Every structure is written in structure tokens, then in C-alpha cells.
């Protein structure tokens, strides 16, 4: 390293072994670099940048300048230089464009992007009535259109989209949009409550009642009357008509090129809109089903009551028709008989010896029961005969020493048993129930007639 003589240096250092002076440290660093201060220099070297105050350089570069290679038609304004002519950095920017800035051909391009239009609802007349209280304005994006040129370069065309808003605006007020940079976001304007009521002249042609589907009109119009719709009904119908294609074409991304303005009502004052017919039908179906279920339960309870009452009457008739005196004289061997309402007296299995005699008795009793069934039913309907019989009565007869071939001896015994039964039945009826005199007489006569017929049939056998 070629260094000048130390006599020409303008440097001073202390001779301490452990130096704590910052000036000495700076001197040592300059000497190590090979640039010590020299005394009596004829020309002054420019001061280092470290010894000067910092200079702020401002360059106006648009965000879209980064996409200059992909968008040759884009326009950029020339950067306004805030540097003075005397600054040493001016020579760097003078004569050639700074690094990162676009060319002059792009700066001087005559094609300029128009300003992105923003629809302000404060200056827009909304076709809503005076009762508008809560409104929500939604921006619904759609997919951007990307076209590829013949040379293989992708270009974004500036597509102006006419806003098919539900407000019925003119062409000058419609929200025409153009494709901008991907980072451009347009915030939705704030809604305004208007106090003016507008007629149907402000509405577009597709919002009229004639162009709307008839099924929607039937749901929203009370009673199915084809009257003129109010503005809020027309807005609601138009939204229902336009929601389906928007949902199909809605992209996943939030930022898009096409925007549509839609108005959603939160509070609807019309009862026809708040309660459409399909909701009423659901409510009616629920109430009708509940009523039908209650009616079925009541019918089942009534049927159960009707089933219980004939059982009691049947048991009472069984007790009245049973005659142990006749049964005791009609068998040689012990036979068990059961009284049934349909078949009269029938034998239990095991008594095969007397089957023929039992069949003859069954024929006589069934014919007797058919002749006396109707008057007995009427009789028991008028008088409550409360006799709790838990099971059908079984009568077991023991063998007797008398011969069946002698019917003359059996007749006095049957008459005696009949008289005892009549007296017993009469006393029991008087003690248990308080019947009328005519009913008592009818009951006694029926018992005597039944017993006479049974005696005749047994004597014939």
C-alpha cells in the first residue's frame, strides 16, 4: 500500500495502550483504508455522504407501472422531479430514464384510461315508498374477461358493463365499469332514506307487473287479485327473478370486473310479503294434522267404551239363562257344560258318551235364544243390571240314581227348582235394584216362559 509520508498526515492519535477516544478509532480506520488526512492539500475533496444531511428523493410512480410489460396501452403520467439542478443526483436522472420507470413512449401515450365511475346513492332517486326503514346495498362481483391475442400475449380488454341495477336509472347514471388493476377496490356507497314517493314511470319495463311470472304474483298478491303492484313489491319480484342467474355465474373471488347493485329489504310492511301463501299452507297443514290426530284418539276411546259395555250385558244374560235344575237331570255321568252366547250350552272335551244328547239340547236352546234375544236386549237397555261376573259359569252335575227313561219323575223336581229360582231372583232383584212395577212383572214372566220351554224340551227327550 503506497501511503504518503507521516509528516504530511493530519492525523493525531494518543499513545495509550487502551484508548477510549472515538476520534482515535476513526483515525486508525482511515489509515487502515489507505486514505489518511493530508496537510496542505491544494484541492478540496468533496465531503463524504456520511458527513451531509440526508437528501429525500421523491418519485411519483403509479401502482399500475409494475404491469407495464403486460399492459402496453396503459398510460402513465410523467414523474415530476423535485430535485434541484444544483444537486449532484440530478445528473443521474438527466438524459436517461431512471431505473424502474417506464419509457417515454408510454408516458407520452395519448390513450388514457377513463376514471372508474362510482355510483353515489345520495344523488340517486330510489323508487321506494316512504315506509323504507332498513336497506342493505350489496355489490355482487362477476368473473373477469381474459382474452388471449394471436401472438400468445395476454391482454385485458377494457370492457364497459352497463349496470342492470334495480333502480331503473338512465344510461348516464348507470354504473359503467372498466377493468382496472387487480388491487383496485371500490367501496359501496352508503344508502340514503328518501322521503319522496315515485310512480311507476321510473321503473324499467321488465319490472312491470305484466312481464313478471304469474306464480310469483299469486304468492305476493293477497287473494289472487290482479291489481297494480306497489314499488316495493316490484323490487322484490325483480330480485327474485334475477337471483338465479347471478348465483350460477357468481365467482369465488371477491374482486371482479362486473358489479351489480341489488337492494334487499329487511322490513316489509305488507302482510302479503311477510306471510306468503306457501307459509300459510304449511301452517294450515300442521293445524289440520293435529286436529285429525285428536279426533282419532277420541274415536278410539269411544270404541273401547263400547266394547266394555256389551261384555257386562253378556255376562248378565249368561247368569239369567243358566238353569242348574234341568242340567242336573239330563246326565248320567259328571259332565261340565259352558254357556256361550252364540252356541248356547256346549260340552267341554272329554265327554264323548253324551254328545248326541248335548247336540239336541243345543238345537233347542239356540231356537229359544233367537226368539227372545230382541226383547231381552231392549229390556236390559232400560234397566242397568249390575252383576259382576268374572268368568263364564261352569256347572258340574253329579250322577243321580234316577233313570232318564222316566220323564214323569223328573217333571216335579224341575217344577220345584223353578219355583225356588223365581223366588230367589225376585228377592235378589228387589234388594239390589229399584225397578218399576211393570219391569218387575215383565222380568218374572220372561223367566217363567223360558223355564217352561226348557221343561218341555227335556220331557220330550
Curated annotation (Swiss-Prot):
Compositionally skewed regions (Basic residues) per UniProt: 305-320
Family annotation (InterPro entries): DUF4647
Pfam families: DUF4647
Coiled-coil ranges per UniProt: none
Chain intervals with Polar residues compositional bias: 349-369
Skewed-composition ranges (Low complexity): 295-304
Region (Disordered): 289-374
Record's protein name: Uncharacterized protein C9orf43
